[in-house]
Amino acid sequence: VSSYYDQVGLPTDLESLNKISSEFINKYRKLYKVCNIHSGANACFEKLRSVGIYQSVLSASMESDLLSFILHFKLDHYFENISGVGDFFASGKSNISHDHLKKLNTDKSKVLLIGDTLHDAEIAQNLEIDCLLFSGGHNSVEILTESDFPIVGTFDEICNYVLD
């Protein structure tokens, strides 16, 4: 999180980081229920599930928040495994990624990490797994092109990529 704040010109000293992060998370917790999930997300999750593709979530969100979000949007039945971090500074996503991969109990060649940040691409590289980047999330397509992984812009494209 601090490296992202630095990139966008926000202060990164510990006090400012704590304040900005706390304010963001508190607002997000209050307002996420008025958000909508991306168009095509439910259809994509259902299509992948219907053909037997195992789906899981690895997130920089606090695990308790992540579970609340997933339950609110009634997505829990799509995911076999859900892993979030233990603090809201997203400092542990790389660390929990190894445990998450172990829980999948499958060959790395069968795992595809679908993410929306360069950090997700870095995690995939560190885990030595394939990655597909989604430009409709945190990082723009311009930023995501810094990675060598393929980029898609819709959930229909995600489904087509996975099913091809």
Model-derived segments and spans:
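Conserved donor sugar-nucleotide recognition element shared by glycan-biosynthetic enzymes
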Residues: 1, 37, 90-93, 151
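N-terminal helical cap/lid subdomain that shapes the substrate entry/recognition surface
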Residues: 1-39
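Conserved H-loop
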Residues: 11, 76-80, 107
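A short, structured active-site edge motif that brings together acidic residues
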Residues: 18, 76-91
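Short, acidic loop-to-helix structural element flanking the phosphoryl-transfer center
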Residues: 26-57, 63-70
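Short beta->alpha linker loops
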Residues: 39-40, 61, 88, 116, ...
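Conserved Lys-Pro-Asp/Glu-containing loop-to-beta segment of HAD-superfamily phosphomonoesterases
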Residues: 92-122
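Acidic, Mg2+-coordinating phosphoryl-transfer loop and its flanking beta/alpha structural elements
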Residues: 112-152
